[in-house]
Amino acid sequence: LDNIEMHWKQSDKIIEKTPEEKATIIAAEMEKWIGATVARGGEAVASYNILSEPLAEQVDGNTFDWGAFMGETDYVRAAVQMARDTVSHNLNLYVSNTFAPEDDVVAKADQLIALVSSFEDSKTVIDGYNILLNVKYSTDAATQLANETAISNMFKAFAATGKKVRISNFRIGVADAQSISADVRTAVAEYCAYILQ
């Protein structure tokens, strides 16, 4: 007999960890990931979104729930501390969330402000809000006035916190228009300017 190979397959063995062990393991992996990301950016990068989409209600298999292992506020506090401890220069750390046309943007702003406030303590400071802003311009005057009022009130709520606010992924669409005339394009441009002011 020659060239005989034998293979055994052993069934998977699950070694269950205690909640404390899981938290320790997850925190160590988080520290590696955040540390490597922030260190790689070096002094050239001074701003990071430390938390993205905390108000998202849809959680699927692609979403890792840090809070389930480390605590709902503790994981954010740990992430902020890890990021700040990694570099010697000042970092601006933001909490980022999408605001869509179908949202009650004022209520959502209030919800995000309250959430950020719950994360902060004497050692944990979040510098600002990163707003992924998607809006619609309406050709209906009353609807558009309501849109502008809501956006204005949203920004007033954020301004009242004294924190920085930045807009990213800014998108604007046109509602209730079959075609977009030159006048509508001008009105959309004015709405963009209104938002950015």
Tell where the protein language model's regions lie, with residue ranges.
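Aromatic-lined glycan-binding groove of carbohydrate-active enzymes
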Residues: 122, 154-171
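Active-site cleft segment of glycoside hydrolase catalytic domains centered on the general acid/base Glu
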Residues: 7-91, 95-113, 139-153, 178-190
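Structural recognition of the beta-strand scaffold that forms the well-ordered cores
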Residues: 1, 46-50, 92-95, 127-132, ...
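Catalytic metal-binding/acid-base residues of hydrolase active sites
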Residues: 54-55, 99, 132-134, 171
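Long, low-complexity, intrinsically disordered polar/charged segments
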Residues: 112-148
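Structural recognition of alpha->loop->beta junctions
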Residues: 36-46, 115-130, 190-197
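Substrate-binding cleft of secreted/luminal carbohydrate-active enzymes
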Residues: 133-134, 165-176, 183-197
